[in-house]
């Protein structure tokens, strides 16, 4: 996994601006400067919109990417969104990609207070706030379908955030907003290294606008390949800088530029999330399923839950788990029949779990965690333990959710197709199936076939997991998923499902009566409850796939073709799949 650079000690560390309010406008005592003036909308148009020629580019382009250093209170974004939506010639399929970096994000209340000064931005601002949930730092992707905008908001310092974006040609920016405080007071953002990173992440058509006319900024951008001009500034400011990238050779990403139709092998949670993300990126998607209906394999369990076992360190893995969990929660919340946003409960802690509990409590994030005393747990959940509730997340109906994700106008599902391999067909990719003829050609193929990934990545680990469904369990009355050494899911149609086993050596996927008894006994011991007899218990057994380092697979697996894989999601499949699918769709 690539090294992840962050200014924060863990994903849940927060940082906000120090603000004084003067006449309803924010002032920074740290930089001894206003964030913006009362005529901010006019200044934004003059400093960023016009120099980047955005009104004309919006009308001519189906896809454009804007990069911003300094999100502030979102005013640049709101004005851009307003102009983007006033551009009547862009079609409903046109998408604005807006990437913004800010080390200290504002609260919802602060943004609302700022918007009171700009009634023309109120509607767009309120729509944004309905999607704005900065529960973790670093990167979050915010889909704003009502505006045809895809916002990537990164809470990090500028240099580290830009470093993390290197290596992906889909991250190239067409127009830059450079909006930090005065270079004399904010040297870190205007450093030579930041300027070089901006240049490296610039497309061949890139331009920039900024309020400053500092010689340092002009020299740095000139050094790294921009033609820079000093022109009249806004209002009382004498000058400002604008720039355009000079001609150069730049490797573009063929998939992101030319891809229009892809095939996905597998319709489980990995395949359906990837298909949904790709369709939302404007691609035509064909999904091939070996069974007689979508999501009839591992993702056909009757009920499942997300798994918020967060980490309080600064590792790449910790950031991945936090980002993927909350991204999944936002996505699933659009499917209220298939996803129940109840939160999740942890209880009955062993020594290892007690250490984890104290780490989470130490984060002091009451917007994410709620503590329960033993008395409160007894009263609320009838459990003999203290508890910790994760307020976001919940449980879901896997097959129904997958099928809902696949009900997209740009997605077609083909059942009863047993995939064998891919082969080159001129500049396209075609597919072989053992039981079907298929002459279609694709720009890219994504293999999301669960255990079928072993055919292309044989080093993956496979195990068997078993669930047990119990009828009439009076000791279990909880309407929220409960986690300890194992888990208990809310009753569905009078059946309470518990899980799960991890069997590395197995010969088939038939449920085991011995595993059923062991799972019931383990659950009774862990949760201090009586589940009764195993007679009449329902059982489900599925394959679980993981990697040796426990990291998911999501990316390109062929050097000369656009063939991708997603899988090995382990026990976190429903938490990881949406973000991993978005990652592949963005390439």
Language model features: what each stretch is:
Residues 57-171:
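The AdoMet/dcAdoMet-binding core of the Class I SAM-like
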Residues 103, 280-300:
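Glycine-rich FAD pyrophosphate-binding loop
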Residues 122-125, 312-313, 337-346, 371-406, ...:
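Helix-loop-beta segment of a Rossmann-like dinucleotide-binding subdomain
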Residues 259-287:
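N-terminal Rossmann-like FAD-binding beta1-loop-alpha1 element of flavoenzymes
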Residues 303-380:
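Dinucleotide-binding Rossmann-like beta1-alpha1 core, especially the glycine-rich loop
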Residues 414-430:
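A conserved short coil-to-beta-strand element within the FAD-binding core of flavoproteins
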Residues 438, 442-521, 526-537:
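Flavin-dependent oxidoreductases
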Residues 534-587:
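C-terminal catalytic lobe of FAD-dependent flavoproteins
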């Amino acid at each position: 996994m690539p090294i992840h650079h962050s200014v924060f000690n863990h994903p849940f560390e927060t940082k906000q601006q120090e603000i004084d309010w003067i006449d309803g406008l924010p002032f920074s005592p740290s930089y001894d400067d206003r964030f913006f003036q009362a005529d901010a909308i006019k200044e934004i148009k003059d400093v960023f919109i016009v120099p980047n020629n955005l009104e004309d580019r919006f009308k001519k382009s189906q896809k454009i990417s804007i990069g911003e250093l300094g999100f502030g209170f979102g005013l640049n974004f709101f004005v851009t969104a307003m102009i983007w939506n006033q551009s009547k010639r862009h079609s409903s399929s046109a998408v604005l990609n807006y990437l913004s970096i800010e080390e200290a994000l504002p609260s919802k209340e602060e943004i609302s207070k700022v918007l009171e000064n700009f009634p023309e931005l109120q509607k767009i601002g309120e729509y944004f706030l309905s999607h704005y949930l900065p529960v973790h730092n670093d990167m979050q992707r915010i889909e704003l379908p009502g505006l045809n905008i895809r916002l990537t908001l990164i809470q990090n310092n500028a240099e580290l955030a830009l470093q993390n974006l290197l290596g992906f040609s889909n991250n190239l920016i067409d127009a830059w907003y450079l909006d930090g405080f005065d270079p004399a007071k904010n040297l870190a953002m205007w450093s030579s290294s930041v300027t070089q990173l901006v240049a490296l992440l610039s497309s061949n058509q890139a331009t920039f606008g900024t309020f400053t006319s500092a010689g340092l900024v002009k020299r740095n951008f000139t050094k790294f390949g921009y033609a820079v001009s000093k022109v009249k500034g806004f209002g009382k400011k004498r000058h400002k800088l604008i720039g355009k990238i000079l001609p150069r050779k730049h490797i573009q990403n063929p998939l992101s530029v030319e891809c229009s139709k892809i095939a996905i092998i597998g319709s489980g949670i990995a395949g359906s999330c990837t298909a949904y993300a790709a369709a939302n990126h404007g691609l035509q998607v064909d999904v091939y399923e070996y069974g007689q209906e979508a999501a009839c394999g591992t993702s056909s369990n009757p009920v499942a839950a997300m798994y918020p076992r967060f980490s309080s360190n600064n590792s790449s893995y910790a950031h991945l788990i936090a980002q993927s969990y909350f991204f999944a929660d936002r996505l699933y919340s659009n499917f209220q029949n298939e996803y129940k946003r109840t939160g999740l409960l942890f209880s009955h802690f062993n020594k290892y779990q007690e250490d984890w509990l104290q780490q989470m409590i130490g984060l002091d994030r009451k917007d994410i965690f709620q503590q329960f005393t033993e008395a409160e747990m007894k009263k609320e959940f009838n459990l003999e333990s203290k508890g910790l509730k994760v307020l976001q997340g919940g449980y879901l109906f896997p097959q129904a959710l997958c099928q809902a994700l696949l009900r997209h106008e740009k997605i077609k599902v083909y059942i009863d197709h047993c995939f064998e391999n891919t082969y080159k067909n001129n500049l396209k990719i075609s597919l072989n199936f053992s039981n079907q003829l298929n002459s279609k050609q694709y720009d890219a193929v994504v293999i999301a076939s669960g255990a079928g990934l072993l055919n292309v990545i044989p080093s993956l680990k496979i195990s068997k997991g078993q669930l047990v469904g119990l009828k009439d369990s009076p000791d279990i009355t909880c309407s929220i998923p409960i986690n300890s050494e194992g888990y208990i899911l809310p009753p569905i149609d009078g059946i309470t499902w518990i899980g799960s086993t991890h069997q590395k050596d197995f010969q088939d996927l038939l449920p085991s009566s011995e595993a059923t008894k062991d799972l019931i006994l383990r659950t009774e011991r862990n949760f201090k409850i009586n589940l009764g007899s195993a007679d009449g218990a329902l059982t489900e057994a599925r394959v679980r796939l993981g990697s040796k380092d426990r990291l998911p697979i999501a990316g390109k697996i062929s050097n000369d073709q656009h063939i991708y894989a997603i899988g090995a999601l382990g026990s976190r499949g429903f938490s990881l799949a949406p973000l991993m699918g978005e990652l592949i769709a963005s390439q």
